[in-house]
């Protein structure tokens, strides 16, 4: 049998004191009567507290003293006064007021005192020598961080309180970054001197720090330290009694206990139970010995976890810690148990072969790859220069070897080599670097010539020529400039400094102000919200302006998910930003893609930029009849919605399919259900880190796509929001939906009103709400019901939902039945690299030498192969992977027109005639190393004079070529099917094709990729919000004539 004990009364602010116990005694009498009945039966002592419901607590009125929490810790009650009963079983008789103690009188029959006696409240009499000691607090393993000296200091300690300001390193770093970003100009700030207060023993000092956007630190403060709250352990003959509850303020942080004496007890008649010796595990200790309330017997000791014991193990190189068992803070399981295991790194898969971390494999004849962290880093072999007229490439090799000239066959005998007889003309491999041929009975052997374009080449087992895994960087020291001679200009004459030559040395010419300002801001990558600072010459420098002081706090009732626009002073105005901020760490050689709204998204653009649809703007009319501005977000009670280019986009929710013929959506519910159902399953909303469409595809913020032929979706704030077609009323009981239709349709001929000439028949219908509908007018009172006015009578039809075969059917807003979309969308996989997500077939750059490609979830990377150079001391240019000869280097090579001022002061546009070298791409860039080496060896490289003449012809031919290409592109777009030829990739030294699971190309026949460009988009007219959020229409009207649906 259980006793449910509930205290009656709760303290409220401003509650008065004085008077008697109020109505609490009447309520307690019933409990005490029940308690007396229970205590009469042996073995029935138990207490079960009901769940706390503060609304059912009665406020204690006219209390003569303080109010205290009841035994269940839920409701407040009046403290017991002098000569009133206290204590008892489970403390049901209440606690004494301040200044009083609960005294338990010894039984008259000489029995021992137990913990269930009822005491009496008497005046306290206290001496410090009654204290035996303190119980330690209950420590927990806590992890967190604090900002100390501008850095995040993180630790894991076992303590009674949480001394950390931030729960994790990420939250601490975010706060530190926000402080740095919003750090104002504090050079003129005046802060008051803040003195640290002296904290009481029960609290600790928290030093103040400057919050984000402020210069002056907050004052230091004292906060309660639970580790200082120790419960007293009293001497024999004394009880530990709660005197006052903690208030949570420094100085009143701990519950105040005092040792109260009990009447002397004769322990000679007390028989103590045997106490077993406790053996604590190695991670814990045995607590102090405690006595019973009468001081006659000792209580069993217990084991507590040792403080500061848990930590993180340090493993040797090549091994990582792995959790064997989780600790729960109990003795024997105080800490997590770790073991050092060999570090398992992800493997690489290529051509159905699995390679472990560090393994090297051959991609083709000239390309090798090494598996590093699950990513294949690929590089090319380094072939040397041959000094012969005839050469060939041995089978399975990359680098060519010299071949002896053709001699007449004088002795067709064979050759004996390595224990085998080789026929005349046979070739064999003597070792990794030596290849031989039998000519006229004698073996003729030549060695492979290897090149070296890096300082630390890597030898591949079984290969002759080493490979370069990393490019070599050469540091160029600053030039030594000579003094200007025969120059009459001084520092005073050139107030904007002197001009510099290509070596960075002064020349006898003064800089203009424009040249000075351009040089100060060029190459600056800062994104300053309030503009750049200026120097003494009023030139912008690469430092951000602080937040302007004159900006007033914006008062705006608009909800802008992307923030507000700023005026010319850098202050926010009540207008919404069109595009969100795009935090993206990708390096995209062709720039970033844009969504249909013209906003940049974190996705690399392909080499040929696709034509983007025109930008559309406008407000949205929601199905509930409310108008929302563009880019506005709201919640309609079931799903999150967003106005995107004039279209209402709402989240797809997962609902079960109702098993009845007349489902409906009840008020306050989101999913359809049968009329007799009471409990309706709530819809499930997913919250992924990036948008994960139901079909399995991943999309980034701002990206728009078609989930099927009827639904267009966009990625907004990590949620997939979709716009769907509004379906007309269904005037039949069992509509069907075909695969090529977006809305259910009636299989039979729709209902038509009778052509009766009876004038007494009414020409309208009236529903229960008093709405008038004309004859033949149809409408939808809710998403599952369609009605029509027929001959003065309203006839309604309920839509029945067909069964589905998928596990998570989705429900579009404005429709009745959930349906499956997993089978209609092909699934795509993504690549995860360095904490970023890349789409399938997306390319990106790690640095100027390493290019990566995502193929079916596998990341493949390649490095640039640099050709040998004809100069002795090549230089390395910043931003370029391969070194180049000094005579080939032109600062900042570009094909963008540059403004230059001639000697007359006129501005001219000059296009530099140096071609910009492109880096090695995995597929599309063709590079013939032998051809390039031959040009440099023969001195037939590009010359500026030749390129100048070519560029003049290009100025005429390039616009014509571009115009023809644009015409061809538009003709191809208008076709139903497009056939796009993919060019062949050629290996550096022989005309073979690359077959590495990236793109398979047949060089002889060519590869044709079929693209289906037929996509249908539906533009929906605004629904009529007069009838329960849906529209009304004349059934006999032609839908196309009313422009209700338009195909674009």
Swiss-Prot record:
InterPro entries, A to Z: Antistasin-like, CRIM1, CRIM1_C, Growth_fac_rcpt_cys_sf, Hirudin/antistatin, IGFBP-like, VWF_dom
Positions annotated as glycosylated: 83, 486, 758, 913
Motif Cell attachment site per UniProt: ranges: 326-328, 904-906
UniProt topological domain (Extracellular) ranges: 47-952
TM region(s), chain numbering: 953-973
Record-linked Pfam families: Antistasin, CRIM1_C, IGFBP, VWC
Membrane topology (Cytoplasmic): 974-1048
Domain Antistasin-like as annotated: residue spans: 481-510, 517-544, 551-576, 579-604
Domain of life the protein comes from: Eukaryota
Limits of the VWFC domain: 346-403, 413-469, 618-675, 689-747, 763-821, 829-886
UniProt KW keywords: Disulfide bond, Glycoprotein, Membrane, Repeat, Signal, Transmembrane, Transmembrane helix
Principal cellular location given in the protein's record: membrane
Any single Gene Ontology cellular-component annotation: membrane
Record-linked PANTHER family: CYSTEINE-RICH MOTOR NEURON 1 PROTEIN
Protein name: Cysteine-rich motor neuron 1 protein
Lineage: Eukaryota, Metazoa, Chordata, Craniata, Vertebrata
């Amino acid at each position: 049998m259980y006793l449910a004990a509930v205290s009656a009364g709760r303290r409220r602010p401003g509650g008065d004191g004085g008077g008697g116990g109020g109505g609490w005694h009447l309520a307690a009498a019933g409990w005490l009567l029940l308690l007396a009945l229970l205590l009469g039966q042996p073995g029935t002592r138990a207490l079960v507290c009901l769940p706390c419901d503060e609304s059912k607590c009665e406020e204690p009125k006219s209390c003569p003293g303080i109010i205290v929490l009841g035994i269940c810790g839920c409701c407040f009650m009046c403290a017991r006064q002098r000569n009133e009963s206290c204590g008892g079983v489970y403390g049901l008789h209440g606690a004494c007021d301040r200044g009083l103690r609960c005294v338990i009188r010894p039984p008259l029959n000489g029995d021992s005192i137990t913990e269930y006696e009822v005491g009496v409240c008497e005046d306290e009499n206290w001496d410090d020598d009654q204290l035996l000691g303190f119980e330690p607090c209950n420590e927990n393993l806590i992890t967190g961080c604090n900002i100390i000296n501008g850095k995040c200091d993180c630790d894991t300690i076992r303590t009674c309180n949480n001394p950390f300001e931030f729960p994790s390193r990420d939250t601490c770093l975010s706060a530190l970054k926000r402080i740095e970003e919003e750090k104002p100009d504090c050079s003129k700030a005046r802060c008051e001197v803040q003195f640290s207060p002296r904290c009481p023993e029960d609290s600790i000092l928290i030093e103040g720090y400057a919050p984000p956007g402020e210069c002056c630190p907050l004052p230091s403060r004292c906060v309660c330290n639970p580790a200082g709250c120790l419960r007293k352990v009293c001497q024999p003959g004394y009880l530990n009694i709660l005197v006052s509850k903690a208030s949570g303020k420094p100085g009143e942080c701990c519950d105040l206990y005092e040792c109260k004496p009990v009447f002397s007890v004769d322990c000679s008649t007390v028989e103590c139970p045997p106490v077993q010796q406790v053996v604590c595990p190695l991670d814990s200790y045995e607590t102090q010995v405690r006595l019973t309330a009468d001081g006659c017997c000792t209580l069993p000791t217990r084991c507590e976890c040792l403080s500061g014991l848990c930590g993180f193990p340090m493993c040797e190189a090549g091994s990582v810690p792995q959790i064997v068992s989780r600790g729960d803070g109990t003795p024997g399981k105080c800490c997590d148990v770790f073991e050092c295991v060999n570090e398992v790194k992800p493997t690489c898969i290529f051509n159905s072969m699995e390679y472990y971390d560090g393994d090297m494999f051959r991609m083709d004849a000239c390309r090798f790859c090494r598996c590093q962290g699950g990513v294949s880093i690929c590089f090319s072999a380094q072939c040397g220069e041959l000094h012969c007229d005839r050469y060939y490439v041995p089978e399975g090799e990359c680098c060519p070897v010299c071949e002896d000239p053709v001699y007449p066959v004088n002795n067709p005998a064979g050759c004996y080599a390595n224990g085998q007889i080789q026929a005349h003309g046979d070739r064999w491999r003597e070792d990794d670097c030596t290849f031989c041929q039998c000519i006229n009975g004698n073996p003729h052997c030549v060695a492979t010539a290897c090149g070296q374009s890096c300082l630390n080449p890597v030898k591949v087992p079984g290969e002759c020529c080493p490979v370069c895994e990393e490019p070599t960087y050469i540091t160029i020291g600053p030039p030594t400039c000579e003094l200007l001679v025969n120059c009459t200009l001084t520092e005073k004459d050139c107030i904007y400094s002197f001009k510099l030559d290509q070596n960075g040395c002064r020349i006898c010419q003064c800089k203009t102000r424009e040249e000075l300002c351009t040089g100060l801001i060029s190459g600056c990558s800062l994104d300053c919200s309030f503009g750049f600072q200026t120097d003494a010459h009023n030139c912008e420098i690469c430092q951000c302006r602080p937040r302007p002081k004159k900006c007033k706090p914006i008062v705006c009732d608009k909800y802008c998910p992307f923030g507000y626009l700023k005026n010319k002073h850098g202050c926010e105005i009540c207008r919404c930003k069109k595009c969100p901020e795009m935090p993206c760490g990708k390096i995209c050689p062709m720039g970033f893609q844009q969504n249909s709204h013209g906003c940049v998204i974190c996705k690399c653009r392909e080499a040929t930029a696709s034509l983007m649809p025109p930008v559309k703007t406008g407000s949205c009319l929601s199905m509930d009849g409310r108008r929302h501005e563009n880019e506005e977000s709201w919640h309609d009670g079931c799903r999150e919605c967003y106005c995107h280019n004039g279209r209402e986009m709402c989240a797809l929710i997962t609902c079960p399919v109702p098993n009845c013929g007349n489902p409906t959506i009840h008020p306050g519910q989101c999913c359809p259900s049968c009329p007799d159902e009471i409990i309706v399953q709530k819809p499930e909303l997913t919250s992924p880190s990036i948008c994960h469409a139901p079909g399995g595809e991943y999309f980034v913020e701002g990206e728009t796509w078609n989930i099927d032929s009827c639904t267009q979706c966009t990625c907004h704030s990590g949620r997939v929001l979709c716009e769907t077609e509004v379906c007309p009323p269904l005037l039949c009981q069992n509509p069907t939906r075909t695969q090529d239709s977006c809305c259910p349709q009636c299989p039979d001929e729709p209902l038509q009103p009778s052509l009766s000439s009876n004038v007494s028949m009414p020409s309208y219908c009236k529903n229960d709400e008093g709405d008038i509908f004309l004859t033949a007018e149809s409408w939808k009172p809710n998403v599952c019901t369609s009605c029509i006015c027929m001959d003065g009578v309203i006839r309604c039809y309920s839509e029945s939902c067909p069964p589905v075969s998928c596990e998570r059917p989705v429900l579009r807003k404005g429709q009745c039945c959930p349906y499956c979309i997993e089978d209609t969308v092909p699934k795509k996989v993504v690549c995860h690299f360095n904490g970023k997500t890349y789409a399938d077939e997306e390319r990106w750059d790690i640095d100027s030498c390493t290019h990566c490609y995502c193929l079916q979830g596998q990341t493949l990377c390649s490095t640039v192969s640099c050709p040998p150079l004809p100069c002795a001391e090549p230089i390395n240019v910043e931003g370029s992977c391969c070194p180049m000869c000094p005579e080939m280097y032109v600062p900042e090579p570009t094909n963008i027109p540059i403004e230059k001022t001639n000697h007359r002061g006129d501005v001219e546009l000059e296009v530099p005639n140096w071609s910009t070298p492109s880096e090695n791409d995995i597929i599309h860039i063709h590079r013939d190393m032998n051809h390039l080496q031959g040009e440099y060896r023969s001195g037939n490289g590009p010359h500026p004079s030749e390129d100048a003449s070519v560029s003049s012809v290009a100025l005429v031919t390039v616009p014509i070529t571009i115009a023809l290409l644009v015409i061809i592109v538009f003709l191809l777009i208008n076709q139903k099917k497009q056939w796009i030829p993919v060019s062949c990739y050629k290996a550096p030294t022989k005309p073979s094709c690359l077959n590495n699971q990236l793109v398979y190309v047949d060089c002889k026949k060519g590869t044709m990729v079929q693209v289906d460009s037929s996509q249908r988009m539906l533009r929906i007219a605004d629904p009529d919000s007069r009838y329960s959020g849906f529209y009304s229409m004349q059934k006999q009207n032609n839908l196309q004539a009313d422009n209700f649906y338009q195909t674009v």
